[in-house]
From Swiss-Prot:
Class of enzymatic activity (EC top level): hydrolase
Enzyme Commission no: 3.1.-.-
Cofactor note: Binds 1 zinc ion.
GO biological process terms held by the UniProt record: rRNA processing
GO cellular component labels: cytoplasm
InterPro entries: MetalPrtase_cat_dom_sf_prd, YbeY, YbeY_CS
The protein, known as: Endoribonuclease YbeY
Record's function text: Single strand-specific metallo-endoribonuclease involved in late-stage 70S ribosome quality control and in maturation of the 3' terminus of the 16S rRNA.
Family: Belongs to the endoribonuclease YbeY family.
Keywords associated with the record: Cytoplasm, Endonuclease, Hydrolase, Metal-binding, Nuclease, Ribosome biogenesis, rRNA processing, Zinc
SUPFAM superfamilies the UniProt entry points to: Metalloproteases ('zincins'), catalytic domain
Signal sequence coordinates: none
Length: 153
């Protein structure tokens, strides 16, 4: 089972967005060959909240589009317990997603899907701190989005 806990701090999120993101992340989970039970949360926030989170936890006093908190980093694996794998939290700023969708000329739904997948890949350990890692992560993103059928059109 793959459980996604959605939280909307904006009161703007459409129920269909939850279904699209859940479907995309289930597809990505299969593409990444994660076979065990897993769970994560996706929270939608505004610019003020994401800036505060970014400042508090990343020491960056600016607005951003998505922040991920991987709960498995540096955590020992507990073997033998019948518990799902807790991947972490994805926080998406809906205001920035809307602006980026306009800027890139694609739908808001496509941008939300892209940001959710980007955050999901971070939870799995992908990163883009250097050029080589960026190529790997962004290539994986594009492969999954294209296979899923969520294009920039």
């Amino acid at each position: 089972m793959f459980t996604i806990d959605f939280n909307d701090h904006t009161d703007l999120v459409n129920e269909s967005w939850y279904h699209q993101i859940e479907d995309l992340l289930n597809f990505a989970k299969e593409q990444e060959q994660i076979n065990e039970d897993a769970e994560l949360s996706v929270t939608f926030v505004d610019k003020n909240e994401i800036q505060e989170i970014n400042k508090t936890y990343r020491d960056k006093d600016k607005v951003t589009d998505v922040i991920s908190f991987a709960l498995e980093e540096d955590e020992p694996e507990i073997v033998g317990l019948d518990m799902p794998r807790v991947l972490g939290d994805i926080i998406i700023c809906t205001n920035v997603a809307e602006e980026q969708a306009d800027s890139f000329g694609h739908s808001f739904e496509r941008e939300l899907g892209f940001l959710a997948l980007h955050g999901f890949l971070h939870l799995l350990g992908y990163d883009h701190m250097n050029e080589e890692d960026e190529k790997v992560m962004f290539s994986r993103q594009d492969t999954i989005l294209n296979a899923y059928g969520l294009t920039r059109d």
